[in-house]
Amino acid sequence: MPRAPRCPAVRSLLRSRYREVWPLATFVRRLGLEGSRLVQPGDPKVFRTLVAQCLVCVPWGSQPPPADLSFHQVSSLKELVSRVVQKLCERGERNVLAFGFALLNGARGGPPMAFTTSVHSYLPNSVTESLCVSGAWMLLLSRVGDDLLVYLLSHCALYLLVPPSCAYQVCGSPLYQICATTDTWSSVPAGYRPTRPVGGNFTNLGSAHQIKNSGHQEAPKPQALPSRGTKRLLSLTSTNVPSAKKARFEPALRVDKGPHRQVVPTPSGKTWAPSPAASPKVPPAAKNLSLKGKASDPSLSGSVCCKHKPSSSSLLSSPPQDAEKLRPFTETRHFLYSRGGGQEELNPSFLLNSLPPSLTGARRLVEIIFLGSRPRTSGPFCRTRRLPRRYWQMRPLFQQLLMNHAKCQYVRFLRSHCRFRTANQRVPDAMDTSPSHLTSLLRLHSSPWQVYGFLRACLRELVPAGLWGTRHNERRFLKNVKKFISLGKYAKLSLQELMWRVKVEDCHWLRSSPEKDTVPAAEHRLRERILAMFLFWLMDTYVVQLLRSFFYITETTFQKNRLFFYRKSVWSKLQSIGIRQQLERVQLRELSQEEVKHHQDTWLAMPICRLRFIPKLNGLRPIVNMSYGMDTRAFGKKKQTQCFTQSLKTLFSVLNYERTKHPNLMGASVLGTSDSYRIWRTFVLRVRALDQTPRMYFVKADVTGAYDAIPQDKLVEIVANIIRRSESMYCIRQYAVVQKDSQGQVHKSFRRQVSTLSDLQPYMGQFTKHLQDSDASALRNSVVIEQSISMNETGSSLLHFFLRFVRHSVVKIDGRFYVQCQGIPQGSSLSTLLCSLCFGDMENKLFAEVQQDGLLLRFVDDFLLVTPHLAHAKAFLSTLVHGVPEYGCMINLQKTVVNFPVETGALGGAAPHQLPAHCLFPWCGLLLDTRTLEVFCDYSGYGRTSIKMSLTFQGVSRAGKTMRYKLLSVLRLKCHGLFLDLQVNSLQTVCINIYKIFLLQAYRFHACVIRLPFGQHVRKNHAFFLGIISNLASCCYAILKVKNPGVSLRAKGAPGSFPPEATRWLCYQAFLLKLAAHSVTYKCLLGPLRTAQKQLCRKLPEATMTLLKTAADPALSTDFQTILD
């Protein structure tokens, strides 16, 4: 029998998802004597290959094979597969084998497919079709019989390995939907996992010895007992087992399957606690009860943790695949971009506004917060169950909370704490759209400290002292409020952080009876969870609603992910100015009510987009968010909206396919740094091959309003020429890829592959092999799951959809509806590609001669011309200045840069910014040496920004490991060949680039350290942090070697030698420069770093040291001095 492919990473991935993973031959052999005859002498090679490559995966909770298993074949293969597909469809199970099949109903008519009574195929399934006609599978059926093959297809998951390192799924639940056991346990704190406790610490920062082995798969090392300060955190995510009597009064919680996923009580008090000695039954996962993006009504959020009664039908060997994830997050995105006018008042629909300040209202509030009842804004209160005594006793306190809310003067607090920072404290008139008035309005944002003062005043007015228990608990919560509003756009605040150092025993309202001398552990954990529910509701509902009611919160174009807080009265005026400017700048036609209705009736699948604005330094940038404004709630067109999204993705995939097949369509367009590197490297090597390097003339130009100025007729003509080709029938295959990286992280991605009938790979084995051959780095150690395949996408249907997309996109602005008469809709995946195709056609027709002996690059709407001919440079500049109306191309002279003199009046009186002939020329984040053509990275964009805000770091669980992984991932992105290639750049330039990369990493290192949770400090485990710095140096040098194959960097005494000690010296120097500015925090690191650097100095040659000191000259890194952190 052929040797089975090894594919160790795929096998490891499958073992983390399934209870058992066996080769097919082994699985069948374990079932009895007849199974040992699966492979026999003389079997065809294709059958032997199938048996060798097939893996049988048994899911957790799967029933065993039938006891009376027969190895006799009764049915044909096609009949058997059809019966299995029908059973899967009837049970409503998602199974790869049944993708593309559905039960017949009124909407899906037609005769059933063969051997079924009520199933039809609405999309091809290449896996199922190839299985039905495969001779190897027919032979397998004859060997194993109907019973076993039905069991394998219905209850197991089959995978076929595809050398060298991948596999594809044949049947079973899609792998991307199966929760990993290892991932589940990572969400449960160490103290409550079924492991034997030995040394270590809570944040898993590890020792120096652990760091060396961290690149390998971790063994299941037992975890340490938590420190005193973290005991409460651990009990939040544990479950207790109260007695049977307690169960009557303290109902357990379960997750309601309703739309808001609230936590509701069940009559059972049984819960689960993991035992080190046995494999436990595991309850289903608790849901994250944060808003899940429904920020428009934060009052609907409720409880935060739940308990489940395990199913009596679950196997004793069931894994923790659905173990509780009692660590929800409240996210800053919940209070972003709030709607409404300029009214500064609490939303009338807010929960506390709808409850009367009485014991009845208090009871309802207690049920919503702690028992998961859904909030009701109208109608009589219904008593569906008796309130447990513990919660009954809480009513007076929550009645006091409702009374405090009713008399709280929110507007007075707002005006007191969030005053306008102007002399006369008046907001400029919104009717004045002059730049000075717009700038003055943009400066009227409230600082986080002012917003915190407002929230603190409201909370102190609202929450009775009895609910806090002590001032200590109140101060802890207020500190978390201040932290919450200081986070960046994508940040989260976890429940563990919210409960850290909160004293549960001080909250007497949590007790169900008078205090005894000792409190059982189960009772203490229950009180802890109840307090967590209240604090989470207070933060995720009340605080978020206050922010959404009184502020418009948004990011800006100049401060990365930092959030700016504008009072509603200020933002309404800013928005009015932005709308007027948008209507003046863009050709929009307002639709009448009849036209809007006609649009809804005719173009059911087209979305109605919404317009919002992002502040700039001196203006507002309009953002048309197509995915945000689908408006399915208003029109009830969810399925049509999904159809639109799928059609948009299909069109995008087809245009990308044509772009790849015909690269000239994109003209001079580059899609990123890798494209720029490939083209720039070829150009530099060609220029340096000349006898004498000519002087180069540089032109940088930026198109004004590129998306809004493109003529629609011209764009339609260009796209029609692309997809109206002879091979205009496209095949679209949608598939998922699941892979595990070197750090053990599992990643899922969903992709589309376009082909024509001439290059179609019809079967999944061929397709997976083709993917590995075409791009082995992108598809390595992966499992491929086919989702669907469409064989009849015609160019005419795609063009019809494109016409609708361009000419009938409706934007809703300030309650009115407009259709765009010129330009292309922004905010979709197509926008950038369409812009590149339009300007690519312009370049092919107008600028072919300009590129002679030179190079023309364009990143979306930013042009760069490098040419040895001054006449070509001037002609190119003149053409762009005068504009190309046919393509809507007009450049912004204020952003145009050249390195040669331009005669006065040559461009109609205007003059671009002129740099010296020899300089570092800026373009799209790069600095290009105009004489040597070497490349540096431009770090000026980091000036006056916060690295802490730009770096999203969620370090609650395994903070140290997360920090190390984050820093290494960012380093790999920054160490690009464009900066490290020694054929493009000199060794000195590469040294400067490496040093600046390390210096930026030092800033990121500091940003991660100051955000470590639970009071973790560098001094507690300085060896770990020194290991991170050392790992960064080693990783950078490894990348440097990969980017320079064939170059001997270690050659001693050679002019281009660059040993690993040199990289390490640059790394230590960069970190010493940054960490010395925070000497109190990093005192324990500075000494070892200085000692290690001195040791390196003794090893490195004098010439190398001179080179390194030149690269680390502070005069070359002045951009970093303006970084805020």
Swiss-Prot record:
Role according to the record: Telomerase is a ribonucleoprotein enzyme essential for the replication of chromosome termini in most eukaryotes. Active in progenitor and cancer cells. Inactive, or very low activity, in normal somatic cells. Catalytic component of the teleromerase holoenzyme complex whose main activity is the elongation of telomeres by acting as a reverse transcriptase that adds simple sequence repeats to chromosome ends by copying a template sequence within the RNA component of the enzyme.
Main localization category: nucleus
Protein name as annotated: Telomerase reverse transcriptase
Region annotated Linker, chain positions: 240-328
Region (CTE): 929-1125
Keyword DNA-binding: yes
Domain annotation Reverse transcriptase: ranges: 595-928
Organism of derivation: Rattus norvegicus
Gene of this entry: Tert
Region described as RNA-interacting domain 1: spans on this chain: 1-239
Residues noted as binding Mg(2+) in the record, renumbered to the chain: D702, D861, D862
Region QFP motif, annotated ranges: 381-511
